[in-house]
Amino acid sequence: LQATVDNGDLKFSNIRVTPFDEKNIPVTLESAKVTGLMVNLQQKTIRAGLAKLSGGRVTARRDADGDLHLVTMFAPRKVQDTKELRKEGFSIAVDRAEIVRYGVALIDQTFQPAVSYDLEQINATISKVAIPAKNTNPFDLSLQIKQGGSVKAKGTLDLLRESVDMRFDAANIALTPLDPVLKRDTTLTLASGKAGASGRVIVDGKKTPPAIRYTGAAAIADLEVQTPAKEKLGGLKRLALNNIVVDTSEKKVAVAQIDVSQPYAKLVINKDKTTNFDVFKRTPAKPAAAPPANAAPAEPAAAPMAITVERVRVESGAMDFADLGLVLPFATFIKDLQGSANGLSSSPDSRASLKFEGGVADYGLARAEGSIQPFAPKKFTDIAVAFRNIELVPMSAYTATFAGRKIASGKVSLDSQYKIENSKLLGDNKMVLDKFTLGERVESPTAVNLPLDLAIALLTDSSGKIDLALPVAGDIDNPEFSYGHVVWQAIRTVLTRVVTAPFRALGALFGSGSETLGDIVFDPGSSRLLPTEQEKPLTISLTADGLVMVQTTEVKDEELIPKLKAIAAERTS
């Protein structure tokens, strides 16, 4: 049979494709036309100058059970041998193929409600299309997203080598349609946010699995997560990832720098010691079914991607913190958080350095600097933390819980060194309290029973400062280990030693190095205060204004009685 078509045109309109058992029409096409058509049946060739699809829409849906609707819909009932198809098939060539003003609805019903994005105004061109493939095909793509955002891409497609090389730019893509993803495991709401990325993508489909390499940048902006009460829980102004390299064949992800601008978080410790993040977690409807006893062994997991981030920089961060598990609820605000972390890596033995600084409440300052193994912090951590000019009155919640007293006045500066090696903690805390006084009593079942006013008076120097050194140690793998408890135990030990041996504390505080301040010695039978003893009460009065000293008398009979007899004998002689 010999038949030819020379420079023909074809046109179809109002195409609708739907399964017999569905009312919805998943595929529509307003018009399809082919111009410059040339067909030669004897040579089995089909040529066209232009193939153009205009208008219409396709719905790509993943059902609740995970099946792709279009794949199921177009699955062939009988698969013909591909080798036979090649023998019998035609060679097809199209100079230019176009898609104009098309739309795609992406729906994922494995989430409830479904995740949905509507791609609109899809315009695409591809040149030099040939089947079987013979050469590379330049292509161009642009589209808008109804929910917000746009995508542009340009590159080449090589069907013979099964490869793609393209550059793309995705801008201002709305993240709020992903709210059902967040709601699957939490009660939180993704209130706002948009994302973007740009760069180059190279795909080599001949490798197994296909190798994908991406170089470029990505960003998230105006992200906000809200609680069920519509309160802001966390978010950020902008997160930018610069100089990204993702290579699936080399199993690596490398980022030169991550810039985080105006991050915010709200952390609340509840009365039962859970956090607000625990409260927002959803309880699974039912536990996952156990695998059958005769199930085949699972395939070994693929090697994880190696992740490296050279630098993370934070600016203008803030956090609201509250602890409701205390006798008096406590809250503070951390502001102007800034700093950086360098050398982050998923390698277990890698160490990262960090340096951060932020304001606490109105006039306080907090700093942290050191190094850590980010994916194994219990193996190695060495962090120095410093607090300066922190008002103590808001800390009454903690003193009320542990000491049964509010704080009337005072400020604190604290230097802490945290060192962890193989889960063993060695901590060193140096604390300076300025003008520190306790206020009214508060009922607390965990309060210590110590004369705290005496301890404070004994510890306060002539300039109104209390200087404490609090070394701590422990095994953080111990389930009963609590760093706060260890520090409080160290403070309690200091206070106990002070009130049970006050003059030893005074001797250490004032430089005598002994307990001699506790004794004022008189010659037996004499009321004259010796010059060597006059310094002791003077020292205490000048350096410890808060103390009231009560002097008691102790008489040593073995020394006094002979002396009194001698004095009496002198008077009668």
What are these model-predicted stretches?
Residues 1-123, 159, 183-192, 205, ...:
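Secondary-structure transition motifs
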Residues 6-8, 166, 214-216, 255-256, ...:
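Transmembrane beta-strands of outer-membrane beta-barrel proteins
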Residues 10, 32, 51, 99, ...:
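Buried hydrophobic packing residues in well-ordered domains
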Residues 39-42, 61, 127-132, 156-160, ...:
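Short beta-strand micro-motifs enriched in acidic
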Residues 44, 90, 156, 246-251, ...:
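Extended terminal
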Residues 50, 71, 175, 392, ...:
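Extracytoplasmic/secreted envelope proteins and their assembly/folding machinery
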Residues 53, 168-170, 218-220, 260, ...:
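Transmembrane beta-barrel strands of outer-membrane/channel proteins
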Residues 139-146, 155, 353-361, 370:
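Short beta-strand segments that buttress and anchor functional surface loops
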